[in-house]
Curated annotation (Swiss-Prot):
It comes from the Eukaryota. Residues 350-419 are annotated as: Disordered. It is found in: Cell membrane. This is TBC1 domain family member 3K. PANTHER family: RAB GTPASE-ACTIVATING PROTEIN 1-LIKE (PTHR47219), RAB-GAP TBC DOMAIN-CONTAINING PROTEIN (PTHR47219:SF25). SMART domains: TBC. One of its GO terms (cellular component) is plasma membrane. TBC1D3 is encoded by a collection of very similar paralogs with multiple copies of each paralog, some human genomes encoding well over 50 copies depending on ethnic origin of the donor. Acts as a GTPase activating protein for RAB5. Does not act on RAB4 or RAB11. One of its GO terms (molecular function) is GTPase activator activity. Transmembrane segments: none annotated. The keyword Cell membrane applies. It comes from Homo sapiens.
Length: 549
């Protein structure tokens, strides 16, 4: 038996062992004589976002009581809007209410309608089960998926137990999507996106929500993961144009210091937005993104640029930029309604100037036409009513995303914080040149921004008419994690000290800030470690609450 056969046999056994642990459930790997895990009630320790706290929460404040009344009054309005969707799907009222916030127990049905999940299920009966079974038998990234699932939303009550029900569903979704869309395969941030949908939707619905989110031209998320996509570069070019017009001093300073694209507020948005702000605000921004589409990305980054303008003009290279990224979080450490008010004003201003979307890409040499790009809404504030469903698997999709920049001469690659690389720009017709990120050993499943850490996450079945969120009786078990300020600064420090990168990965295990127990160590108390060496890359985890919790 040669080396290839031995390696294939080992991987097959490893894959079977991982699948078996999830099938056994959260008690997988424990000795039988330990008995059942003692039940613990979280009635007074779970906040309205589903995060488990070690101490009992204080009584409701007057402001929180006001939020209760507001949530109840909005619930009936959203129910009426869902009942007459054809009337409201393209109305201004839908956008107005999205900026005010969706009630928690309406969010699942509303996301389902916005992403056309029922239509996809009717067009593809039984397809999810087929993809899931194929993924179990042939997944090439199951170790990475298992590792990322173990660190996804671990402070949320739905994902608290290792190998629990929600973790098993999350594994199934990621395995099925890897098989369904081989162009994207698996990227680390997909686990957080899928976990977000699982908090509000059943397993199969969450899978089709992930498919629609990446496939639809309206949201353009596939361009952040596909090696053929151009979403990031198009938005980056448009951001430079908008900032140069509205804030020429800021843009001039960026050009003078030659700050790389990874260090732009767009990059900070991708890496920090969902980890460095309160969960409630993250949810509000996610609602707006699903309703508005990619047009919401530019106003969000523009707000951060405006708030941090003075600090940005004093920034240069990695060290100071790390401090800016840290302060970028403070942009969002404000009242949720205030942030959404400024976001709405920024959206209207950019829409009026037709700066909310990049221009269409020019046709490539030898092609007859370029990929169509959603048009800016001009002075109107209307939501597109026609949300196109993909005709089939992503293999038949048109070229996924545009690139707004004109043809340029080649440039040398520039290393950026966190291990990412600013991609070289080649003239039209030379797209076959290998990516610098791959040349330096970057993961093949991701693209320009190699680290999205998490996405918003919330419970699915809160009843606003019953006891308020703090005292709600959750019947499932799960969790949430967030990125500490030290971890936000770590990528830049490691970029300046490459020799310390591997050493820090082994010397600084992540800990649970509430319990003082490492995530990995706590999981090992519940289950036996996977046999064989781990061939996946290392990554640090942290679980401190972000500001505003």
């Amino acid at each position: 038996m040669d080396v290839v056969e031995v390696a294939g046999s080992w991987w097959a056994q490893e894959r079977e062992d991982i699948i078996m642990k999830y099938e056994k459930g959260h008690r997988a790997g424990l000795p039988e004589d330990k008995g059942p895990k003692p039940f613990r009630s979280y009635n007074n320790n779970v906040d309205h976002l589903g995060i488990v706290h070690e101490t009992e929460l204080p009584p409701l404040t007057a402001r929180e009581a006001k939020q209760i009344r507001r949530e109840i009054s909005r619930k009936s309005k959203w129910v009426d809007m869902l009942g007459d969707w054809e009337k409201y799907k393209s109305s201004r009222k839908l956008i107005d209410r999205a900026y005010k916030g969706m009630p928690m127990n309406i969010r699942g049905p509303m996301w389902s309608v916005l992403l056309n999940i029922e239509e996809m299920k009717l067009k593809n009966p039984g397809r999810y089960q087929i993809m899931k079974e194929k993924g179990k038998k042939s997944s090439e990234h199951i170790q990475r998926i298992d590792r990322d699932v173990s660190g996804t939303l671990r402070k949320h009550i739905f994902f608290r137990d290792r190998y629990g029900t929600k973790q098993r569903e999350l594994l199934h979704i990621l395995l099925a999507y890897e098989e369904y869309n081989p162009e994207v395969g698996y990227c680390r941030d997909l686990s957080h996106i899928a976990a977000l949908f699982l908090l509000y939707l059943p397993e199969e619905d969450a899978f089709w929500a992930l498919v629609q989110l990446l496939a639809s031209e309206r949201h353009s998320l596939q361009g952040f993961h596909s090696p053929n996509g151009g979403t990031v570069q198009g938005l980056q070019d448009q951001q430079e144009h908008v900032v140069a017009t509205s804030q020429p001093k800021t843009m001039g300073h960026q050009d003078k210091k030659d700050l790389c694209g990874q260090c732009s507020p767009l990059g900070c948005l991708i890496r920090i937005l969902i980890d460095g702000i309160s969960l409630g605000l993250t949810l509000r921004l996610w609602d707006v993104y699903l309703v508005e589409g990619e047009q919401a990305l530019m106003p969000i980054t523009r707000i951060a640029f405006k708030v941090q303008q003075k600090r940005l003009t004093k920034t240069s290279r990695c060290g100071p930029w790390a401090r800016f990224c840290n302060r970028f979080v403070d942009t969002w450490a404000r009242d949720e309604d205030t942030v959404l008010k400024h976001l709405r004003a920024s959206m209207k201003k950019l829409t009026r100037k037709k700066g909310d979307l990049p221009p269409p890409a020019k046709p490539e040499q030898g092609s007859s036409a370029s990929r169509p790009v959603p048009a800016s809404r001009g002075g109107k504030t209307l939501c597109k009513g026609d949300r196109q469903a993909p005709p089939g698997p992503p293999a038949r999709f048109p070229r996924p995303i545009w690139s707004a920049s004109p043809p340029r001469a080649p440039r040398s690659s520039t290393p950026c914080p966190g291990g990412a690389v600013r991609e070289d720009t080649y003239p039209v017709g030379t797209q076959g040149v290998p990516s610098p990120a791959l040349a330096q050993g970057g993961p093949q499943g991701s693209w320009r921004f190699l680290q999205w850490n998490s996405m918003p996450r919330l419970p699915t079945d809160l009843d606003v008419e019953g006891p308020w969120f703090r005292h709600y009786d959750f019947r499932q078990s799960c969790w949430v994690r967030a990125i500490s300020q030290e971890d936000q600064l770590a990528p830049c420090w490691q970029a300046e000290h490459p020799a310390e990168r591997v050493r820090s990965a082994f010397a600084a295990p992540s800990t649970d800030s509430d319990q003082g127990t490492p995530f990995r160590a706590r999981d090992e108390q519940q289950c036996a470690p996977t046999s064989g060496p781990c061939l996946c890359g290392l990554h640090l985890e942290s679980s401190q609450f972000p500001p505003g919790f």
